[in-house]
């Protein structure tokens, strides 16, 4: 029996990963991290979506220490989300160490459950400027987990080389485009569905959806060539 862990936020990307994983594994478990994020309601959305889609279980893990250490517009209500890059070249929504911590803990959880894969929705194509979303980072931490736990584990990144339009196409391929559009939370300001329409995350999501809806056949063909 095959088992996978999905690092799950209840957003577009992780929900699309969950939808796909449910067709590929016998048991799919979700893990969500509570780090005092700006839109904390994502935890409730993640619980609801994981149940509705049929995950075997959903674990919420308290990692509040990350909030104390990582100063970001996603961990501090008094720091507005900015469209401009900081002096270091990163967006102010970058949470230092977030995916290092998340993937490490998900790997430990996979060890506990005997899962062979951890699935995460990070993506390098529509690069948001987050260094911990890069393919080389994921491969590096994957190797460290295998060495550190002396057990085979694969961190899978099904969206890594997809653009946002192709991610929408992937949801549509499984008949879940409307579900993802209406029930997921990607917005930095906590607005479910199409979002606030103003934050960088909403811009990326909307532009991708528009690109897919305007060019369904070629986008789907591009997606199929990458699967």
Curated annotation (Swiss-Prot):
Gene3D superfamilies: HUPs
Coiled coil: none
GO biological process: queuosine biosynthetic process
Sites where the protein binds Zn(2+): 187, 196, 199, 202
InterPro entries cross-referenced by the UniProt entry: QueC, Rossmann-like_a/b/a_fold
Cofactor note: Binds 1 zinc ion per subunit.
Annotated residues for binding of ATP: 8-18
MF (Gene Ontology): ATP binding; ligase activity, forming carbon-nitrogen bonds; zinc ion binding
Pathway named in the protein's UniProt entry: Purine metabolism; 7-cyano-7-deazaguanine biosynthesis
NCBIfam families: 7-cyano-7-deazaguanine synthase QueC (TIGR00364), PRK11106.1 (NF008317)
One Pfam family linked to the record: QueC
Protein name: 7-cyano-7-deazaguanine synthase
Family: Belongs to the QueC family.
UniProt keyword list: ATP-binding, Ligase, Metal-binding, Nucleotide-binding, Queuosine biosynthesis, Zinc
Swiss-Prot/TrEMBL catalytic activity: 7-carboxy-7-deazaguanine + NH4(+) + ATP = 7-cyano-7-deazaguanine + ADP + phosphate + H2O + H(+)
Cofactor or coenzyme needed: Zn(2+)
Function: Catalyzes the ATP-dependent conversion of 7-carboxy-7-deazaguanine (CDG) to 7-cyano-7-deazaguanine (preQ(0)).
EC number: 6.3.4.20
């Amino acid at each position: 029996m095959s088992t996978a862990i999905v690092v799950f936020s209840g957003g577009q990307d992780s929900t699309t990963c969950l939808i796909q994983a449910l067709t590929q594994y016998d048991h799919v478990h979700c893990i969500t991290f509570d780090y005092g994020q700006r839109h904390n309601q994502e935890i409730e959305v993640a619980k609801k979506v994981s149940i509705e889609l049929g995950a075997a279980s959903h674990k919420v893990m308290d990692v509040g220490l990350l909030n104390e250490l990582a100063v970001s517009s996603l961990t501090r209500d008094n720091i507005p989300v900015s469209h401009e890059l900081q002096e270091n070249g990163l967006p102010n929504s970058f949470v230092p160490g977030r995916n290092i911590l998340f993937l490490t803990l998900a790997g430990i959880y996979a060890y506990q459950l005997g899962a062979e894969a951890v699935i995460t929705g990070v993506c390098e194509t529509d690069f948001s400027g987050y260094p911990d979303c890069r393919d080389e980072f994921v491969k590096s931490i994957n190797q460290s987990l295998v060495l550190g736990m002396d057990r085979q584990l694969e961190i899978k990144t099904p969206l890594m080389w997809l653009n946002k339009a192709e991610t929408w196409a992937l949801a549509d391929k499984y008949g879940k485009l409307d579900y993802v559009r209406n029930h997921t939370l990607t917005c930095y300001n906590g607005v479910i569905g199409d979002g606030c329409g103003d934050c960088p995350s909403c811009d990326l999501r909307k532009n991708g959806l528009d690109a897919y809806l305007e060019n369904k056949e070629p986008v789907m063909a591009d997606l199929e060539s990458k699967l």
